[in-house]
Amino acid sequence: LFCLNAQVDLEYYLGDISNYNQSIPTPESIIGHQVGELHVSHDKLSHYVQEVSKYSDRVKLVNRGKTYENRVSWLMIITSESNQSRLEDIRKEHLELSNPKNKNIDISNMPIVVYKGYTVHGDEPSGTNASLLLMYHLLASDSQETKDLLENTVILLDPSMNPDGHQRFSQWANNNKNQSLNPDSNDREYNQYWPRARTNHYWFDLNRDYLPNQLIESNLKIQTYTEWLPNIMTDFHEMGTNSTYFFQPGVPQRKNPLISDLNQDLTKEIATYHA
């Protein structure tokens, strides 16, 4: 995401945007630069999600609480206008799917619920930056494909799962980047001082806190999960250019005995598809 010159525009990322709603503000119009020219900071991200939510009936913006450094953990609930008008009913109907006593629920017209979480590790920034493009596309595109998607989907968009870590990284990277981009991995921009920005305020790896659930950021995510019980959970990470991409199921011998074999079968199918 950050190997580009400053001349890129939205069409570089999104293709033809001629059918986009012009009343929906672009990321650049709010944060002051094109996505990818600089690392978006959490304060600029917060500004954009608040502003763009004012102009669309497709989104409900939720302030879930604040981190240890007093940054807001935002959740954008994005779906069609008609679904927004009955969002609580949709949520309650969806939760009934988890009730084993309800075996004959008609799901033919029930939207799927998808949670999309970005950058739980603060120095894996492409997720949060890409989320700006996704939220703009979902709120501005008037294509029939997008309308159909939103009519059949409730998207729980969590643009920054680690606000404090992401802020720490964006400040470091923007302070140390060159006007002429330097691809050398030894450049100061790519080598943060300890404790770096992977962690939250207390230097804890939030990707290890889903089960112990000790930290505010994890509490807020799990609260969203239990309120909705989404059909699909996505957790967008980033890996270095010299690394192979990790997919479950991983090494079979390391499987927790409490994890079902079905989980192994499903994740292997997903990994095989992407491979």
Language-model features, listed with the residues they occupy:
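Surface-exposed loop and adjacent secondary-structure segments within mature catalytic domains
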Residues: 8-19, 74-80, 90-96, 101-104, ...
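Active-site-proximal loop/hinge segments that shape catalytic or ion-binding/gating pockets
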Residues: 214-274
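Acidic/histidine-rich, surface-exposed loop or edge segments in extracytoplasmic proteins
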Residues: 17-37, 116
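The substrate-binding groove and active-site-proximal loops of carbohydrate-active enzymes
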Residues: 33-39, 120-125, 202-215, 222, ...
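Loop/turn elements at helix/coil->beta-strand transitions in domains of secreted/extracellular proteins
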Residues: 56-59, 71-73, 110-113, 151-156, ...
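Bacterial Sec-dependent N-terminal signal peptides
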Residues: 1-9
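Divalent metal-coordination and catalytic microenvironments
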Residues: 41, 70, 119, 157, ...
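A non-catalytic alpha/beta surface segment that caps or lines the substrate-entry region
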Residues: 42-82
